[in-house]
């Protein structure tokens, strides 16, 4: 597999290299960055991707792919036969269990998947390389600014220039700090932890989400525990929590995982952990996601669903959007990208963040969970929210409920923030 190419031009002055040029520079080789590179390179752009990790690195994740993510993989023509197919979601709230298939007849496929990130990321970045993108591993790239405009990057002692630079480096790092693309301080964020274990139920075709978690003090946790069967003899087991919960600063993720493990160990016949549990932070906002000469995509743009911590699908979609726009007109891409993302995602994600302030109160969380799975109709709406299937274009009952909720919570936003747990 080729991971370097000669697609980037080398501008020279005499015998000394001055700068390398390309049509598009991408900081980060995860799903979002790879999606941008695939789409742009197939469209004829000269693309260079930088990642500070080595090829084949793992990424801490739940490994679940929603039908929305599958639709994006289909659009990118990335095969996923090796992934474990998932038909729906099992939601558990106290003694209530509901098993629901992913909706059919929508603009998304009727199935999802579980695909460990090491293999998913490799398939995507290999696709970018095959399309002609140059991939530079173990190379940290930092934006180069001319005034307030990003004109390229410095990486590995060299400099590249391009009409557009895409920030796809996940949770904020040095590049995000330089561009002011960090998390908004008073907005919610999430923490999650996961590991793997062997299970005879590894081939189940449903994701399982336990919505009624409690910390070691018995306080309800706004978040969920998950069992994601990988189809390879193992399951991904983890828990996630929102920063809006009462007592969040004292939350012990390892203890929360052990508590959840105790709930599911028998029903899933779990073996010992196959690796040490690993935790990560889930950004759910960004101070900036575009500026002259640059855009941020995926996690770097805060595109994570507060209701489930999922963002792979949003990363793939935002990467495709950015690539299509830069192929059309790099000069106007940042502003058009921001409008496109706002139209598609901002309403739903802002509503999710506001809702997270509500469910940070234990009594509201308990009441809300009873409602969320109380009837088939409400459970189906919950399924679509948990599956990232709701956005500004969603039709039908789920769309109407979302838009009504959006209006109410937008009006109540100041009160929600003042009265947070």
Spans of features found by a protein language model:
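Beta1/beta-strand and adjacent pyrophosphate-binding region of the FAD-binding site
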Residues: 17-32
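Conserved N-terminal glycine-rich FAD pyrophosphate-binding loop of Rossmann-like flavoproteins
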Residues: 53-76
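C-terminal helical "tail/cap" subdomain of flavin- and related membrane-associated enzymes
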Residues: 324-421
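Glycine-rich FAD pyrophosphate-binding loop
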Residues: 25, 38-61
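Conserved Rossmann-like nucleotide-cofactor binding loop
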Residues: 32, 55, 172
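FAD/FMN-dependent oxidoreductases across multiple families
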Residues: 243-326, 331
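Predominantly flavin-linked oxidoreductase catalytic cores and closely associated redox partners
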Residues: 43, 127-267
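A conserved beta-strand/loop capping segment in the N-terminal third of enzymes
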Residues: 70-123
